[in-house]
């Protein structure tokens, strides 16, 4: 064993051994409990960052710990490889997106291997590989046959910089989540997944995921947004048409004084009178350029335009002017809102701006609202007024009564509504999975036959930066023959949203070599669901919701038997430096390559695991990195120093141990218990590492180390340190384990078990209070009774001065913990 710890020598050696021996390659083994561990796979941007280091280190600790506990661990890695950055790089550097992507994958793979991550690299996949996306095309067509995929014209979020469509979830504060450009509205023919078919199941199953953070589940429930209410028909004055409204506040129907339509509403122009048309069209054009998220923000200025049309309130028969309003969205409810300005704040602000009438229909207890004097809408429960037969009722009770009345009168129906909308997956870009359909003027939309799959991306596309979809300019790709009628036709040039690829990759990891379909049902049946999934909170209503939908859809197609993909979810915190998330623009980036070159991967891993609990943000500290490096050097020197003394010592004989050796052994077994609990139940890596550090201190303080009778307990202590550190710092642990004379590797040795008897304290430390205030502590035998504890307390030099000259009225003893002496 070398006297000095040189990370580069140690880490290179063991990484080579792991690769040669295929140490982390796994197959299905029914004789072992399985454990499927997965971190969210990265986009191959070119370099890993410290967020990756932290995320993957967290996962690796779990994987190595579970292996040492006897689990058959699947821990794969791959690449979420489609997306706009590759096209942007192609324009900038004049190289093909595939070349840029695969070069990045090669480099990032080498970085991950240098971190010592225990991946089964034989299962590696990249979503841009034809062997991956061809199966996605097959599943797309099967979903199309089942009515889970359809095409329609719709207003979409459009990023003018990326020149592509964004899902609602990909718009952040009105900006593109990729490039931060302002998002506008554009009407396009789009392909959709019918995720709404699963809205109720997606919602209900959030209650069956106890291993998920509650805040993620709440975010998904809110996104799905189930609400109970009524659909009400409002006749249009002078026309046969009606405007259908969904509301959860039918108790306010008698106070509805005007109608607000989304500017995109299909009836918007139909209802507009000729003299109002120019102004209405100008307003619609203006709103189309505004992002939906901004439009619904509380502080966004409420604007509208009168259409010239009127609806009739079906219960009051009053005329209601019909407005288009910028805060009403087509994709919630019906896109039409019965406006009740006295009891809805947005309607109130709009009514004040456009001088529209107000009618109070709910009065608070003991108060009378005057519409003219109101400064804000009243939105709480109260007593019904100006509401015909419902006057005097509590408003929450009146909801059901009014719903029944509307159904009896044939003007409304009780309805359940969901905020969730179908998932638009069309993207106007090259570097994505081609949508496998053909557009024929005679036959319409024609699925590509199975025998013609996969539809492969052409390699001769040109990336000029001129805008638009490069795929649409490749004539050899676009111009095809209709497989049904033989006429000239055009291939679909939209590609799929990259979230489609990440919605099922965890299933393909179970069977990456399967050549008969996307998923081997038997192998997926062994591994699924993923037992522990690790990734960022930012994916709560994007990737995580889509993956849940895909799993349910594929279950119904017969590919899998599970209904949920991820049993447990850990959302790790960010890496912070100088008070902000690391980013190039802020100049606070730490380069993992430089860190590993200087300190080694084990130090990088140890610091990121020790500095904060996984779910919390980690504040970067150069001093903390130095401290982690010093600790590994201490452990190395400790093993080097005790090696001559422990030789081939066997297991300790508890009956033959002296007091000091017995104390050390107690510390060893208490530490094993502590670290096991921290890793197995809580993922408290920082407290587990802290416990091992305390054990190292105890070993260093233990004397005499060179006494033959102490060799067994010293060997047990040092070996336990190495085994307990193995999931955190695997290279150092393997090297030290080998130096201690073991063959087969520290991970193969299994996880150390603790002896409950060895953890029992022989003495107890009792806190002594006088009149409730701490005055001393006494040590007594573990089996000492109350009288012995009192005697020790009365004799203690720190306690006696507080008792002298005082009358002891009583003593209250909490066994094994505390003695409170009451004096007067």
UniProtKB/Swiss-Prot annotation:
Q: What is this protein called?
A: Leucine--tRNA ligase
HAMAP family, alphabetized = Leu_tRNA_synth_B (MF_00049_B)
Q: Record-annotated residues binding ATP?
A: 584
Motif 'HIGH' region mapped to chain: 42-52
Family matches, as Gene3D superfamilies: 3.10.20.590, HUPs, Isoleucyl-tRNA Synthetase, Domain 1
Q: Listed GO cellular component terms?
A: cytosol
| Catalytic activity of the protein | tRNA(Leu) + L-leucine + ATP = L-leucyl-tRNA(Leu) + AMP + diphosphate
Tell me the GO molecular function terms: aminoacyl-tRNA deacylase activity; ATP binding; leucine-tRNA ligase activity
This protein's major location comes to: cytoplasm
Name the NCBIfam families on file: leuS_bact (TIGR00396)
Note the Pfam families from the entry.
Anticodon_1, tRNA-synt_1, tRNA-synt_1_2, tRNA-synt_1g
In which residues does the motif 'KMSKS' region occur?
Answer: 581-585
Q: Which family does it belong to?
A: Belongs to the class-I aminoacyl-tRNA synthetase family.
What organism does the record attribute this protein to? Geobacter sulfurreducens (strain ATCC 51573 / DSM 12127 / PCA)
Q: Name one GO biological process term.
A: leucyl-tRNA aminoacylation
Print the keywords alphabetically.
Answer: Aminoacyl-tRNA synthetase, ATP-binding, Cytoplasm, Ligase, Nucleotide-binding, Protein biosynthesis
The places in or outside the cell where this protein is found are: Cytoplasm
**Which E.C. number(s) belong to this protein?**
6.1.1.4
